[in-house]
């Protein structure tokens, strides 16, 4: 019988906790699908689809992709209870994840949103969250 090692819950400082709470609040206020983007230096990466109950990260491409390396991961995330796992996955596999974009009710993020001004943004360390 194979036993799986239980992963320790990550420890976050106050800024990280506040940031995760802000992201959760924004997701809980949204209706329908949203698009999450992880990118570096204004280069858009893959799309991530979410609703107020959960998120499926189709392809997680971290900043290592833009520095000659490449990392890809598929994972199911329960946004309400487990959204911080996205940050933990990013921390484990890349030195920096620069930007997370959230665009409500849009499947394809138009090029005009690359570097576009946003209505709301919160940040913690290397992470930024934008609500257009």
PLM features: residue spans?
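A short, well-structured beta->alpha microelement
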Residues: 53-65
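C-terminal substrate-binding/active-site "lid" region of AdoMet-derived donor-dependent transferases
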Residues: 98-131
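Conserved SAM-binding loop of SAM-dependent methyltransferases across substrates and taxa
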Residues: 42-52
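Conserved alpha-helix/loop element of class I SAM-dependent methyltransferases that forms part
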Residues: 13-33
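Class I SAM-dependent transferase core
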Residues: 1-18
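Conserved class I S-adenosyl-L-methionine
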Residues: 31-41
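A short acidic, Gly/Pro-enriched loop at the edge of an enzyme's catalytic core
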Residues: 64-74
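A short glycine-rich, Lys/Arg-flanked "PGG" loop and its adjoining helix->strand segment in the class I
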Residues: 84-98
